[in-house]
């Protein structure tokens, strides 16, 4: 039951771009166990309903799903445990200052494996969209598609 391991892992949080207005992005390292990185390399992770918090000067990602590794034994990881993100102090201060301002949150938008084989998470400072903003986004996207179709003819 050996599964194909891809070198081009890109796990995206498509829901974040719909629910939030993304303002500023940062690329962060993530602290993982051995079975977690193996599951990510197999593409068995999800960023849906994931969020970040700043706690004691550290950034933590909460509710991120990484499936248990199929070949893992008794030392397999918990699928939804909290994971620490690695950023510079300057980036952490900037994020912490933005989160203290009302209405802002930190949302992971993408999980990928870089060229060195390390897992990285792209987090964004975001502001929640209202229902009418979401409808406007859908309307703009549909209009863009119709214009593209018209130009192709």
Swiss-Prot record:
GO terms for cellular component: cytosol. InterPro entries: SmpB, SsrA-bd_prot, SsrA-bd_prot_CS. It holds the Pfam family SmpB. Keywords: Cytoplasm, RNA-binding. It comes from the Bacteria. It is found in: Cytoplasm. Residues 131-153 are annotated as: Disordered. PANTHER family: SSRA-BINDING PROTEIN, TMRNA-BINDING COMPONENT OF TRANS-TRANSLATION TAGGING COMPLEX. Required for rescue of stalled ribosomes mediated by trans-translation. Binds to transfer-messenger RNA (tmRNA), required for stable association of tmRNA with ribosomes. tmRNA and SmpB together mimic tRNA shape, replacing the anticodon stem-loop with SmpB. tmRNA is encoded by the ssrA gene; the 2 termini fold to resemble tRNA(Ala) and it encodes a 'tag peptide', a short internal open reading frame. During trans-translation Ala-aminoacylated tmRNA acts like a tRNA, entering the A-site of stalled ribosomes, displacing the stalled mRNA. Belongs to the SmpB family. This is SsrA-binding protein.
